[in-house]
Amino acid sequence: MMFPQSSSRHSGSSHMPQQLKFTTSDSCDRIKDEFQLLQAQYHSLKLECDKLAGEKSEMQRHYVMYYEMSYGLNIEMHKQAEIVKRLHGICAQVLPYLSQEHQQQVLGAIERAKQVTAPELNSIIRQLQVHQLSQLQALALPLTSLPMGLQAPSLPISASSGLLSLSALGSQGHLPKEDKNGHEGDRRPDDDGDKSD
């Protein structure tokens, strides 16, 4: 009776290490698979983060470029406004020295110069658009060396958005140019009048 019990004990003890060995190996395989899955997810997330970082740097470059362009346009608008003020002051100083007939002609020309029609304004905006696009392309040339294929199509959109802001200030920035042209046209009859006198 003792021998079967000892044999059953030996068989049970020999079976347990095999079962433990099998479960440990299976657990290691599962851990390895999960680790590989996590590593693949980490790699994909790292690639996505690198892509987002590249897009962020591109947006920062565009922001700096547009800020510099906007600042330059603002300075130019103030410069043109100051030029118009000075030219208007010169006209006001010269006007009393003209004859009565020439004064009426000059005043009429000044009033006509202040009345800018929509077609004239559209023509001015188109000229500014061509000029701004050439400037944008010149500024964007160093940036196009990067692998960003969406830069070239985005230039007209940004230019049009800049023109929308310019159109709101058109009465302040573009009318002075017309006034200046009007004053230049007004000086010609004045000069003729001076020559005739």
UniProtKB/Swiss-Prot annotation:
UniProt-annotated stretches for the region Disordered: 1-20, 169-197
Q: Where is the composition biased (Basic and acidic residues)?
A: 175-197
Gene Ontology MF: a single term: transcription corepressor activity
Q: Which GO terms describe its cellular component?
A: nucleus; transcription regulator complex
* Positions of the UniProt region annotated as CCN domain: 166-197
| Localization of this protein | Nucleus
Q: Name one Pfam family in it.
A: TLE_N
Which coarse location class describes where this protein primarily resides? nucleus
Database matches in InterPro entries: Groucho/TLE_N, Groucho_enhance
GO BP annotations of the record are: negative regulation of canonical Wnt signaling pathway
Post-translation changes? Ubiquitinated by XIAP/BIRC4.
Query: Which keywords are on file for this protein?
Result: Nucleus, Repressor, Transcription, Transcription regulation, Ubl conjugation
Q: Where is the composition biased (Low complexity)?
A: 1-15
Domain comment? Lacks the C-terminal WD repeats.
Described function: May act as a transcriptional corepressor. Has a possible role in the negative regulation of proteins containing WD-40 repeats. May be required for the initiation and maintenance of the differentiated state.
The protein's name in its UniProt record: Amino-terminal enhancer of split
Provide the species name.
Xenopus laevis (African clawed frog)
Which lineage ranks, top first, belong to the organism behind this chain?
A: Eukaryota, Metazoa, Chordata, Craniata, Vertebrata
